[in-house]
């Protein structure tokens, strides 16, 4: 049986290899055919993640990382989806003037997301989440010669900054209330935290999760992002628009205030209706998918 420590080390080694491979592809002297090797290297962390998912029993904390089935599942899912999108992009984007830039940005986006969801330290989660959103913004604005993607990137960046700052403040307030950067699933935070601080954390978490999920009234960033190439829209589903459920799962020992839960329920319900309306009204299939995504994310947050 492979130990969790060995698998975690192997996982990070394969992530580093994937990142370096993406950077190598930026070099003009590297032939375009190198993309085949890059795609092969992208499979390595996915394989390690699947092995970790199969072999893990219970929950193991190794340094600043907490390994359980959810962590390995999300990590492997994000990287697998990233691999599929890059494989599709290898031919779909061929001929694009920014062809070489897409693949390292895809890789960075999924690598940072997967590391964040494996982390047990809230500070690392905030850092990785911020880097993931930054890379996604760069993907949206990659075609700088066209003003429309640049404006879409600005709208997305403003929304992402608000959501990221909300998550950062939630973590800081949590630290003020508990003196710890780690959420302990066995801890009763109704006792260890004051009601006021816990309410603030929960309300900040609501803001932090509804923005990446494109919930009302922050759906404009996803609507504007349809100007980006199809694979860029697809990469948003690699632990980004669906990150709200993951964040709330990680914060579940803290996120149980009735006011925050009711607010999230109302916002998600409104978003489901708006998303359904967008899907019915628009004839553009990408905007129909935006409406579908809003509705699906709203339903997932309602169930949480």
Residues of each region from the PLM?
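Adenylate-forming
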Residues: 68, 303-304
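Transmembrane helix-loop-helix hairpins at membrane boundaries of multipass inner-membrane proteins
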Residues: 1-104, 179-191, 195-197, 220
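Alpha-helical transmembrane segments and their immediate interhelical/interface regions
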Residues: 1-13, 117-136
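Hydrophobic transmembrane alpha-helices and their helix-loop junctions in integral membrane proteins
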Residues: 84-100, 106-125, 135-302
